[in-house]
Amino acid sequence: MWLFVREGFFSVVCARQGDGKRGRPIDPERVMVRARVRAHLEALQARFPELLGGCEIREFPGADYAWRLFVPKSVWAEVVRRLAEDIDYDNFKAATARRQGLDGAAYVEALHAVWRTMLGLQRQQL
């Protein structure tokens, strides 16, 4: 699952058993919330301290996603539910720019690039 929210971009997949290293079987009850920007995970933790505050942000240098949280799938489901309930805007990119400020300018530009790419996909269908 890819998730773009005002706090950042996350790729969420089933965690692997044990220490989560490659080659281990997946753990269907636990997910890895992966990010390319550490501050995105920190913002998510700050938004949901009661759910994610106790989770350590682990660094995996050289990995596709360098920063990760490991959480029970049920906790992640609650985070996503609350994110959905908190939608209070009519333009995601503009709301994200307001939330991120100058520090998040690169993320907002990346959102525009994703938007343009998906617009191209739509145009191929028309």
Sequence positions of predicted segments:
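Structured alpha/beta or helical-core interaction and ligand-binding surfaces enriched in interleaved
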Residues: 1-126
